[in-house]
Amino acid sequence: MNKPDRAIKIRPEYHLIVTEGTDTEPAYFGAIQEIINKQYPEKIQLKVFGVGDNTISLFEKAKQLAKENPNGYRHVWIVYDTDDFPAVHIDRVVQLCTESSTDEIEYHAVWSNQCIELWFLLHFGFMQSDIHRSEYWPKLTECLKKIGAGEYAKNRTDMYHILRPYMDTAVANAKSLDAINYGKTPSKATPGTKVYELVERLRPYL
């Protein structure tokens, strides 16, 4: 008599998200982590770290965190703002991600020029103006008040849930900026953001 085949247990796909910020980005991606890890534990698992480092040091920290996980991460996302950091450091992270990626683990540079608030603003409309990041916050407050969501603050913990209904708009607008910035390095893509690539990867679970 033939023995019954044993069920093959498929491991979930592990993602590590390491952010430069310790408030805004961890709160936004932490909300995504909570939803996905709760609803799809057998398919995909996320871990979010807000470490406070920037550009190259952020990449090195992400690489170290990835090594420390016994499960092994399939994707490591390095989320950072360009702010006023040296252009060579901003662009070097992209190169490091490419150089360090293998068949087992893929590193992604998720930059925003100038800051993640650009990604938030793109939920409400297309914006191509190269303005200083300090001008994003009053614009965000204006947009949020129009939908009855109050004022913007970097330590708000509800931004993902507020913006979720407008996610498709943000992705489309970010892709339009990406097309305009084609061929430019992150430091020259003003404005621009790659957050949409991470969100698109996770969107089937949201």
What feature does the model see in each segment?
Residues 21-25:
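Short acidic, Gly/Ser-rich segments with clustered Asp/Glu that frequently serve as metal-coordination loops
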Residues 1-14, 26, 30-49, 56, ...:
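C-terminal accessory helical subdomains adjacent to catalytic cores in phosphodiester-
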Residues 16-20:
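Short hydrophobic beta-strand that contains or immediately precedes a catalytic carboxylate
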